[in-house]
Design a protein with these regions (language model features):
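Tubulin/FtsZ superfamily GTPase core signature
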Residues: 1-178
């Protein structure tokens, strides 16, 4: 990954592997790495975006732990998550639902992207082509919020405005169209 600052969650526990579709392993991995997570949240941080795909183990289990820590520090905490494709199976959908319910407890706003819509919006037929397009939707959501704060075109909108609008706002959905 080209990301300059990253944390490998639960290195001892997972030995560099994923959570094997087990959210409890993902949760424990985040707890193992909580001191590193805390260090990322220190300083001038005022807003945190937590993005993940729900339904597997790492994102489903770790994201709520990270969100809880961020929110406990008074940071504006925004989750931007994807629901698994239907063909990924009922188990993934059930884990995703449980993960969303847990995530809601620890974020100010939760933006949910249903991966099934990717096929319709982008005209994609192939699962492997749809994955980067789902990532693009997540990035666009985060960038859109950040741009509102940072753009001079929105002179009357600053972090305080976004904070007040998004603090405790609950679930949001992204509409997609072309």
């Amino acid at each position: 990954s080209v990301v300059p600052n990253k944390i490998y969650l639960g290195e001892k526990m997972t030995q560099g592997l994923g959570a094997g579709c087990d959210p409890e392993v993902g949760r424990k991995a985040a707890v193992e790495s909580i001191e590193e997570i805390k260090s990322f949240l220190e300083g001038e941080t005022r807003m945190v975006f937590i993005t993940c795909g729900m339904g597997g183990g790492t994102g489903t289990g770790a994201a709520p732990v990270i969100a809880k820590e961020a929110k406990s520090r008074g940071l504006l905490t925004i989750g931007v998550i994807t629901l698994p494709f239907t063909h990924e199976g009922i188990g993934n959908r059930r884990r995703a639902t449980a993960g969303i319910n847990e995530m809601q407890k620890h974020v100010d706003s939760l933006i949910v992207v249903d991966n099934n819509k990717i096929y319709d919006v982008f005209g994609t037929k192939n699962y492997f082509d749809a994955l980067p397009q789902a990532d693009e939707v997540l990035c666009t959501a985060v960038k859109g919020i950040a741009d509102i704060i940072n753009s001079s075109a929105h002179r009357n909108v600053d972090f305080a405005d976004v904070y007040n609008r998004m603090r405790g706002s609950g679930i949001a959905r992204i509409g997609m169209g072309r």
